Amino acid sequence: MVSSSVYGQEELLDRIYVLLTSLGYEVWMSHRGSVPTNSNETTLESCLKAVENCDSFLGVITTDYGTTSPGEISITHQEFRKAIELKKPRWFLVNDRVIFARQLLSKMGYKTPEGRHRLGLKTLKPCLSDLRIIDMYEEATEKRIEDGQAKVKWVQKFYDTDDASIFTQTQFYRFLDAEKSIREQYPDLKKRGGRR
C-alpha cells in the first residue's frame, strides 16, 4: 500500500505506482483508485482496513497534510499510525521541505508537537499546509532513547520525483527478493497462516 496526500503530488505518486507495478506488486493507492473499498464503509474505514490487509507499506510525507475533518488528524496520518502500530514492513519518504521546517522550528525553540501548537501557526504556507506534517515525520522515525542513545527508524528525504523513485525501487526490489527467498525456504507458508 502507498499512503500519501494526493494534492500536488500526482506525478510522484504515478511514478511510484509504475515502479511498483513493474516489479510485480499489486499496488493499493487511493490516487489510482486501487484501494479496496466497501460501500458500507467510510473512506477512513476503507483506508485503515487496507493498511491492516496490506503486505507492505510505503508512506510518503509531502508538504500537504491531506484530507481531514475539523479537530481530526488526516486520513494519511491515521494510515501511518496504523502501519506503525501493526508493525507492517514499512518504508517512509519525506519531502526535504518538511525536514527544513522542522529544523527551523526546532532552532527557534519549538521542538515538540505541543510547542509547535503553542506557536499558534497552523501552516507555514507555501512550505507546509499544516504543521502536523512534522508530527507525521517524527512518528515515522519512531525515535526512542535506548542505553542513553537516540535510536530512530530510517525515513528517506527526497528533493524530487527522481530521488523518491531511486529509494522506492531499491527498497522494494530488495523486499521482493527477500519475500521470494522466504517462499523458497518455506513452501508451506500459506498453510501456516501466511498470506501468500
For the regions a protein language model found, what residue spans apply to each?
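Conserved catalytic or regulatory cores that recognize and/or transform ribose-phosphate-containing ligands
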Residues: M1-R196
